[in-house]
Amino acid sequence: MVRGPQGRPRSRWVSFIEWFNKVIMDAEVYDYRYPVKGAYIWRPYGVAIRRNVEALIRRLHDETGHQEVLFPVFIPYEFFSKESEHIRGFESEVFWVSKGTGGEERLVLRPTSETAMMPMFKLWIRDHTDLPLRVYQIVSVFRAETKMTHPMIRLREISMFKEAHTAHADRDDAERQVKEAVGIYRRIMDELCIPYLISRRPDWDKFAGAVYTIAFDTIMPDGRTMQIGTVHYLGENFSRVFDVKYLGKDGQMHYIHTTSYGISERIIASMIAVNGDDRGLLLPPRYAPIQVVVIPIMYGEDQSVLNYAKGVSGELLNAGVRVHVDDRRDKTPGWKYYHWELKGVPIRLEVGPSDVKDNAVTLTRRDTFEKYAVERSNVVDAVRELMKAIEDNMRKSTWEWLRSHVRRSSNVSEAKALLNEGGVVEVPWSGDDECGRRIMELTESDALGIPLDTDETPSDLRDAACSEKKAEYWLRLSRRY
């Protein structure tokens, strides 16, 4: 039996995609039966989860001076084709819009919005007082994926794409923004109990048109990694193409420096994947649509238990807790336990005749299934304490699990064997692109890049594929989605 964070059984995780597809369908998060490849439906419970996550994203961007915008889904081909490296990176993935009348205008469904934003930045930015400019939007983007699509993981319509775009007077200020963006993403992942690795992508895998790319990756239960966020320093690459300049304090015209950074519904997929178990979802309490489900255990026509349960529910609602009373008469308590465990509700509150008599309730944690008898007068404080304990335990256990799946090796044959077991392997690398590609070829893996979440460097080691070269960095390798 496979065990994941917190030692919870994960026998189904031997086939992760099968488990994932089943749980998001059974928990009524997502429906992937829509008859268009790579396009899926968020069901009401999934939308509720998504809205809570989007609120977190908006809060952290708003707090750091970003302003929300909403751009059209169409990008004129004239704009899209201006940056040659960018179009080379995306042209094979774009959807083209053709007019029914056969008109000449060529439009692209946005795959990302750098080329849509820059012409507007040119209109909005006049002098140094207009900088920095920081905007973001949460929208659909479209990629003509030719690989196998997976619900919430590899899509043709990415329907929850948060992209931020910023403009700055110089490289120093733009790179300060890159650091701030990394900090924002750290906070998002931490609050969603998603462990992560931060790496600088190798040049051959950076964003099309970027000077460099920083990426967040997490490890899925099957040992593959998934990219869950990226931050790009774009330098003057786009501003020169679109001729976006500002009047500086020195009275001279200068090109702006830009950044962009994005995350998508993959963060929800990761939150589900790294925390769930054989019973279903386990949601971080602050972002669960329902934080406490109340199960009245009733006998006959006696209404006292139900009235008591609704009274406790009202107290929790007044305290700001998202609570639901499951008072259905056609379902047994056992069925309800299973149902709400599947949906990942963090706390179950049970009320039976003895609880009414004792003026108490019974609380059960979704993460450990420990039970607690609590006096009614203490129920609000107990729920708050339990939600914090659950979140702390989720974060601690998922980080421990991720760290246990990152290993090091100084030679490619051992690295390949470790990669076959799953997880991330770090090998010594000179920094030479050709040697890096050779490492990937020999280990049959993908290069995530150079670790940015540790200052350690190889000591007296040679490049894993080019022994004549001294290693300067660790290179992270994995098999990835």
Curated annotation (Swiss-Prot):
<dbReference type="GO" id="GO:0006433">
    <property type="term" value="P:prolyl-tRNA aminoacylation"/>
</dbReference>
<dbReference type="GO" id="GO:0005524">
    <property type="term" value="F:ATP binding"/>
</dbReference>
<dbReference type="InterPro" id="IPR002314">
    <property type="entry name" value="aa-tRNA-synt_IIb"/>
</dbReference>
<dbReference type="GO" id="GO:0017101">
    <property type="term" value="C:aminoacyl-tRNA synthetase multienzyme complex"/>
</dbReference>
<keyword id="KW-0648">Protein biosynthesis</keyword>
<dbReference type="GO" id="GO:0005737">
    <property type="term" value="C:cytoplasm"/>
</dbReference>
<dbReference type="Pfam" id="PF03129">
    <property type="entry name" value="HGTP_anticodon"/>
</dbReference>
<dbReference type="InterPro" id="IPR017449">
    <property type="entry name" value="Pro-tRNA_synth_II"/>
</dbReference>
<dbReference type="InterPro" id="IPR002316">
    <property type="entry name" value="Pro-tRNA-ligase_IIa"/>
</dbReference>
<dbReference type="InterPro" id="IPR016061">
    <property type="entry name" value="Pro-tRNA_ligase_II_C"/>
</dbReference>
<dbReference type="InterPro" id="IPR004499">
    <property type="entry name" value="Pro-tRNA-ligase_IIa_arc-type"/>
</dbReference>
<keyword id="KW-0067">ATP-binding</keyword>
<protein>
    <recommendedName>
        <fullName>Proline--tRNA ligase</fullName>
        <ecNumber>6.1.1.15</ecNumber>
    </recommendedName>
</protein>
<dbReference type="InterPro" id="IPR033721">
    <property type="entry name" value="ProRS_core_arch_euk"/>
</dbReference>
<comment type="subunit">
    <text>Homodimer.</text>
</comment>
<dbReference type="InterPro" id="IPR036621">
    <property type="entry name" value="Anticodon-bd_dom_sf"/>
</dbReference>
<keyword id="KW-0963">Cytoplasm</keyword>
<comment type="similarity">
    <text>Belongs to the class-II aminoacyl-tRNA synthetase family. ProS type 3 subfamily.</text>
</comment>
<dbReference type="InterPro" id="IPR006195">
    <property type="entry name" value="aa-tRNA-synth_II"/>
</dbReference>
<keyword id="KW-0436">Ligase</keyword>
<dbReference type="GO" id="GO:0004827">
    <property type="term" value="F:proline-tRNA ligase activity"/>
</dbReference>
<dbReference type="InterPro" id="IPR045864">
    <property type="entry name" value="aa-tRNA-synth_II/BPL/LPL"/>
</dbReference>
<keyword id="KW-0030">Aminoacyl-tRNA synthetase</keyword>
<dbReference type="InterPro" id="IPR004154">
    <property type="entry name" value="Anticodon-bd"/>
</dbReference>
<comment type="function">
    <text>Catalyzes the attachment of proline to tRNA(Pro) in a two-step reaction: proline is first activated by ATP to form Pro-AMP and then transferred to the acceptor end of tRNA(Pro).</text>
</comment>
<keyword id="KW-0547">Nucleotide-binding</keyword>
<dbReference type="Pfam" id="PF00587">
    <property type="entry name" value="tRNA-synt_2b"/>
</dbReference>
<dbReference type="Pfam" id="PF09180">
    <property type="entry name" value="ProRS-C_1"/>
</dbReference>
